[in-house]
């Protein structure tokens, strides 16, 4: 399965959204939302970056999450995205200090 498809499905399930609801919230017509999201999740079609941005916004994940090759990196990307700027700066400083040891 293409990594985008895997990440999309994981994020959708975590958000407790149906394929149809996610599609509608991302601006896809109600009549085709479910089918189109299914095609994205199965890797049959690839969304353009504009759609990726809309999906990311609805799912509260950064666009980079969808393209992270491994699960640990994907988790780090999401965690950093969901904390505020001060917490992110502190996490980065801690990480830099740890890596320089």
Task: Walk through the language-model features, giving the residues of each.
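Short alpha-helical DNA-recognition segment
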Residues: 16-39
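Alpha-helical residues within the helix-turn-helix
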Residues: 13, 24, 57
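Interfacial/linker helices and their anchor residues that mediate assembly or domain coupling
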Residues: 70-101
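DNA major-groove recognition helix of helix-turn-helix/homeodomain DNA-binding modules
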Residues: 44, 48-65
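A short, Lys/Arg-rich alpha-helix, primarily the initiator
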Residues: 1-14
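Phosphate-coordinating loops and pocket residues in cytosolic domains that bind phosphorylated ligands
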Residues: 39, 67-68
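Helix-turn-helix DNA-binding elements, focusing on the entry/boundary residues of the two helices
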Residues: 8, 19, 34, 49-52
């Amino acid at each position: 399965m293409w990594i985008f498809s895997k990440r999309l499905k994981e994020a959708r399930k975590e958000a407790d959204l149906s394929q149809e609801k996610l599609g509608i919230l991302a601006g896809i017509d109600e009549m085709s939302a479910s089918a189109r999201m299914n095609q994205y999740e199965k890797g049959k079609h690839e969304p353009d970056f504009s759609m990726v941005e809309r999906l990311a916004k609805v799912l509260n994940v950064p666009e980079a999450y969808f393209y992270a090759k491994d699960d640990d990196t994907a988790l780090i990307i999401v965690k950093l995205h969901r904390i505020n700027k001060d917490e992110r700066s502190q996490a980065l400083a801690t990480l830099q200090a740890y890596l320089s040891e």
